[in-house]
Regions:
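Predominantly cytoplasmic-facing regulatory/coupling regions of multi-pass membrane proteins
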Residues: 1-90, 146-254, 276-312
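Membrane-interface alpha-helices at helix entry/exit sites of multi-pass transporters
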Residues: 82-87, 101-106, 113-130, 279-290
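Transmembrane alpha-helix interface/packing and boundary motifs in multi-pass membrane proteins
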Residues: 91-98, 246-262, 266
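Mid-bilayer segments of alpha-helical transmembrane spans in multi-pass integral membrane proteins
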Residues: 93-102, 130-138
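Re-entrant/interfacial helical elements at transmembrane boundaries that shape
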Residues: 102-115, 256-274
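Hydrophobic alpha-helical transmembrane segments of ABC transporter permease domains
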Residues: 127-149
Length: 312
């Protein structure tokens, strides 16, 4: 390759990275402005320490899911360090604010790229981890809503439908069939051999990891209420309600394919908060908007920190 061609490729690579950054920044700005507008002009007794706590709990809640993705990469035969996996996982969340969800895959697969990491298998692992999280979230929501909102079966059956949509592709036989249908590993024997995984053990591991994640995300919603000065809806007394509200709204938002589920996630969360906690529409609206802002700002902060972490 001539020096001129090499320089041109490097220039195009830099330009592409800058374009990705600009796209992500633009859609994050749009999401943040919409969420801020939802807060309206109502006055709340904001508690800064609880706002920070809600963000910290959210980031902690993502950790088990990131660890599960690392597990998936390892059993797929990919050699990557845990710090690199978690770095890619957290930064990759910014991609969900770009239409189509594809930017999540682009960011994660690009950041995890290494000589001993197959890009095709890395992409497969991202879909597998994400669908596992969505399936577990819908499963938990369905179980809780079947008891807590027995009179409103729409939410229960909606959770069941979402669980089937996200859970069916991760069943081992279905997963292998879909991977073959997509042509993954067709031209690489080692890649094809690694796709003999997953088994039902991986589903069990995902159930455990993702359940912990969802519980912590529910705790972040509780901390958001505390940040608003609402202290009469305790976490231990209403833990299942927090869990159902967060999980069902997030799963529905994800499967809507709208950037960050904006609108869909917020509407379902609002409706569930009103029904499960018997609070006003105004309180539920502010909680929903504030939760989105706290989570987005937390993602921006951790991504900015991790971006400058040196990787090998």
């Amino acid at each position: 390759m001539s020096p001129h061609s090499s320089f041109l490729i490097k220039l195009l690579t830099v330009a592409l990275k800058l374009l990705i950054v600009v796209l992500v920044a633009w859609f994050i700005r749009d999401t943040l402005l919409k969420a801020w507008q939802q807060l309206g002009r109502q006055t709340w007794n904001w508690q800064p320490l609880w706002i920070i706590s809600a963000g910290a709990i959210y980031l902690l809640g993502l950790l088990p899911a990131g660890l599960y993705w690392h597990y998936v990469l390892k059993v797929l035969g990919q050699q990557t360090q845990l710090k690199n996996t978690l770095r890619a996982y957290y930064i990759g969340h910014l991609g969900k604010y770009v239409p189509g969800k594809a930017m999540v895959v682009v960011l994660r697969a690009g950041l995890i790229r290494a000589p001993r990491v197959d890009t095709a298998l890395a992409t497969v692992s991202i879909f597998y981890e994400t669908l596992t999280m969505m399936a577990v979230g819908a499963f938990l929501a369905a179980g809780i809503l079947a008891v807590r909102l027995r009179e409103e079966r729409m939410f229960f059956w909606g959770a069941i439908a979402l669980m089937i949509i996200s859970g069916f592709p991760i069943l081992p036989p279905v997963f292998r069939f879909l991977a073959q249908l997509a042509g993954i590993g067709k031209s690489n024997e080692s890649t094809c051999a690694n796709l003999s995984w997953p088994g039902y053990t991986s589903i069990l591991a995902g159930l455990v990891c993702m359940s912990v994640s969802w519980i912590l995300l529910a705790a972040s919603l509780w901390a958001t209420f505390r940040a608003m000065g609402v202290d009469n809806i305790g976490l231990f007394e209403h833990g299942p309600e927090y869990l159902a509200a967060v999980s069902l709204s997030m799963v529905a938002g994800f499967l809507s394919f709208i950037p960050a589920g904006f609108g869909v996630r917020d509407l379902i969360l609002l409706e569930l908060l009103v029904r499960l906690f018997a609070i006003s529409d105004a309180t539920a609206t502010v909680a929903s908007a504030m939760l989105r802002i706290i989570w987005l700002v937390s993602e921006l902060i951790i991504s900015a920190i991790l971006y400058f972490v040196k990787t090998k």
